[in-house]
Swiss-Prot record:
Protein name per its UniProtKB record: Small ribosomal subunit protein uS8
Ranges in coiled-coil conformation: none
GO MF term set: rRNA binding; structural constituent of ribosome
InterPro entries the record matches: Ribosomal_uS8, Ribosomal_uS8_CS, Ribosomal_uS8_sf
NCBIfam families assigned: PRK00136.1
GO biological process terms, semicolon-separated: translation
Subunit (UniProt): Part of the 30S ribosomal subunit. Contacts proteins S5 and S12.
Keywords from the named record: Ribonucleoprotein, Ribosomal protein, RNA-binding, rRNA-binding
Family named by the database record: Belongs to the universal ribosomal protein uS8 family.
Any one GO cellular component localisation term in the record: ribosome
Pfam families recorded: Ribosomal_S8 (PF00410)
Function: One of the primary rRNA binding proteins, it binds directly to 16S rRNA central domain where it helps coordinate assembly of the platform of the 30S subunit.
HAMAP family per UniProt: Ribosomal_uS8_B
Amino acid sequence: MAITYSVGDMLTKLRNASRVKHGSVDLKMSNMNKSILNILKEEGYIKDFNFLEKEGIAFIKVLLKYDNKRNPVINKIDAISTPGRKIYSSYKNMPRIKNGYGILIISSSKGVITGKEAKNKKIGGELICSVW
């Protein structure tokens, strides 16, 4: 049985669904995915998400967000760390995404937070993805 990287799978599904202008996308449930989606919702990159169950398997239904001209709010969403290549950063060396217009999502000892929060709290962590 193949093991999937749920975060990478989620990022790919969000990217593909927003490019073809779908209204929503279903993702496999995981605590990491839920934490990342909470940040994306707080930062205004998605409308909302809710939980559902199909045939005993838990899913997250994500409602994608578009501007007035039906352009996706998520222009680019890229994984930074992968299962085979984890990338860590201290708060001092946290990269800026699109000169401050994008966000960096990291996994730290305080949970999944944005790069801006990590700098304010002076904690580093694993760089999960960048969004702009």
